[in-house]
Amino acid sequence: MQAKAVTPRPASTILLLRDATGTDEIEVFMMVRHYEIDFNSGALVFPGGSVDKGDQEIIARPELYSGGEGLDASALSFRIAAIRETFEESGILLARPHGSDALIDAKRAGEIEAAHRAALCDGKTTFLKVIIENGLLLALDELVPYAHWITPEGMPKRFDTWFFLAAAPPEQAGAHDGKESTDSIWVSPREALAGGESGRFKLPFPTTRNLIKLGKQTSVKAALDDGGGKPIVTVMPVMTKLNGGRQLRIPLEAGYDGEIFEVGTA
């Protein structure tokens, strides 16, 4: 009997960036997934997660976000979910006070986190309520589309994921939630990839490819400029088994320095 096709679930993730001190490198905020989670358990990943119905409710309130001009409902939902999930998973909040051009500072972000993050993660409040009660404007314009990956066909759990770049708000350091993730770190792409090679970190294939791509940039500005100047090519890897090993094929034009990659034994 042929397995029922699994429809990919819309999801978003943000690569939060800051310039490393004393080096020509950037650092990205990453977290270790809890080992009991059924997708990417134990993996080092960027903060993110699924689009939910609450994100759709925010779309209908354009006075609650900036940077939505010219975007359809789908594009808006991916961006709103990216900011919400990043706040839930890291405490970092990409938002402005109403009437201000500046992102909220670390002190205000900490107050909002202390008051609402746990309740939001537990489903006891909504992101819409958090935004309204704190007079916030979600900074969708801070997000730079970077990549679009869809889990291969045939997998039991599939995601249709947009990756965004964003400069981390000044002094917002971030921290894992202790539930879905058990550790967090600001790390250069070089260090993260070295950890994957040594076995210190478990890196999913899309994470590895995006870290390699990101590691070519020497500053946050360079990364944002580079990401904002290129078309996004959707990547849905195709897996093949050959001589006891596995290969993943992705579009060469997606910009990951190759088309066929060895990913371990079959």
Each language-model region and where it sits:
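N-terminal leader/linker segments that precede catalytic domains of diphosphate-processing enzymes
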Residues: M1-A266
